């Protein structure tokens, strides 16, 4: 199945999205306003600019590798290729634009094909620390819009592609349910503050933040272990069937 191309026009220089002359909102702005308003409050603008430029460069060299087979000498580009090989990622497209054609639009870093109707979405992160909660919301919104734009298609996996120097990890992310994403968008459209059902309130009964992060990591590791165990079983059964058919 071929993916549907959005009619929304993306101006890369101004980073704006327009449809029939009407400007749509990007996803990053909504996430910042509704969920992570103080994420970079104490970071100097010069540092943010430098990080953004570095991130853009790494995105570009990875895209060159995917689209043109041009292998850049940077460590991140080499590590990205290593991750693709290790996990058997079947590249479909980069910067895939998705939209509800009314309010929101955004470009997905990476789309990988799992089957004729199943896809995985990846987002490249180059930060010092990987903010899994941020990328969870980002990719979940992408998944919702992706399936809306491509009826019959299913997003089966979401993952962050963490590339920073010698760090290269593919981190699978749990999807936020669609009904929660719908509520988030409705709040943004109405000019209301979204109530995050996953937010942790400070109190005597809550675990310290570092233990909460450890607990979340354990959950994600278990989910990844289950996925690859299922894949191993699927491949093993396939080999056995071929051996039986061949009379081995």
Protein language model regions, located:
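A short glycine/serine-rich beta->alpha loop
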Residues: 46-48, 127-130
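Conserved catalytic cores of phosphodiester-cleaving nucleases, focusing on short active-site segments
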Residues: 58-59, 106-128, 142, 221
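A structural signal for short, well-ordered beta-strand segments and their strand-loop junctions
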Residues: 93, 121-123, 159-160
């Amino acid at each position: 199945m071929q993916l549907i191309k959005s009619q929304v026009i993306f101006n890369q220089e101004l980073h704006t999205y327009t449809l029939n002359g009407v400007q749509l909102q990007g996803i990053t702005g909504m996430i910042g306003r509704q969920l992570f308003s103080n994420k970079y409050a104490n970071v100097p603008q010069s540092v943010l600019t430098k990080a953004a430029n570095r991130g853009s460069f790494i995105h570009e060299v990875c895209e060159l590798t995917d689209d043109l087979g041009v292998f850049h000498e940077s460590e991140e580009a080499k590590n990205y290729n290593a991750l693709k090989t290790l996990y058997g990622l079947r590249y479909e497209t980069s910067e895939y634009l998705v939209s509800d054609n009314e309010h929101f639009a955004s470009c997905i870093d990476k789309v990988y094909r799992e089957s004729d109707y199943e896809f995985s979405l990846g987002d490249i992160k180059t930060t010092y620390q990987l903010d899994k909660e941020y990328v969870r919301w980002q990719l979940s919104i992408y998944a919702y819009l992706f399936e809306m734009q491509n009826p019959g298609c299913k997003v089966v996996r979401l993952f962050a592609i963490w590339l920073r120097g010698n760090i290269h990890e593919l981190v699978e992310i749990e999807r936020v349910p669609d009904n929660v994403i719908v509520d988030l968008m409705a709040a943004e459209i109405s000019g209301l503050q979204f109530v995050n059902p996953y937010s942790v309130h400070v109190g005597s009964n809550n675990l310290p933040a570092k233990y909460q992060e450890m607990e979340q990591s354990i959950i994600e590791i278990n989910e990844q272990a289950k996925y690859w165990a299922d894949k191993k079983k699927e491949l093993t059964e396939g080999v056995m069937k071929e051996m039986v058919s061949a009379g081995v």
